[in-house]
Structures are given as C-alpha cells and as structure tokens.
C-alpha cells in the first residue's frame, strides 16, 4: 500500500540522521 511505503520512507528518513548522530556522539566528534 502507499501508506506502508510512505511510513517506511518516513522511518528511514528519521532513523538515518539519528543513527549518524549516535555514531558521532560515540566517536566524540561533537
């Protein structure tokens, strides 16, 4: 369904930056 696809895209769009942020915090780049 279109709704399912939009939900997956939204989750990836939100999770992507969060994962990058967490990795940056662990490495101490901030």
Curated annotation (Swiss-Prot):
Residues 22-30 are cytoplasmic. Keywords: Membrane, Photosynthesis, Photosystem II, Thylakoid, Transmembrane, Transmembrane helix. PSII binds multiple chlorophylls, carotenoids and specific lipids. Pfam families: PSII_Ycf12. Belongs to the Psb30/Ycf12 family. PSII is composed of 1 copy each of membrane proteins PsbA, PsbB, PsbC, PsbD, PsbE, PsbF, PsbH, PsbI, PsbJ, PsbK, PsbL, PsbM, PsbT, PsbX, PsbY, PsbZ, Psb30/Ycf12, peripheral proteins PsbO, CyanoQ (PsbQ), PsbU, PsbV and a large number of cofactors. It forms dimeric complexes. A core subunit of photosystem II (PSII), probably helps stabilize the reaction center. PSII is a light-driven water plastoquinone oxidoreductase, using light energy to abstract electrons from H(2)O, generating a proton gradient subsequently used for ATP formation. This is Photosystem II reaction center protein Psb30. The gene is psb30.
